[in-house]
Amino acid sequence: NYCYYMVDYLTFYNIKNYKIYTYAQRLLEIYFSYLSI
């Protein structure tokens, strides 16, 4: 049970990090598109 919870927590943490990463990527794209105008 403990191992299962550990894996569950890690996948949740990875998904959270991935969302933050994609959000940052989107912000950078918007920022650079503003710079190019």
UniProtKB/Swiss-Prot annotation:
Q: Which domain of life is it from?
A: Eukaryota
The UniProt keywords, alphabetically, are: Malaria
Provide the protein name: 24 kDa antigen
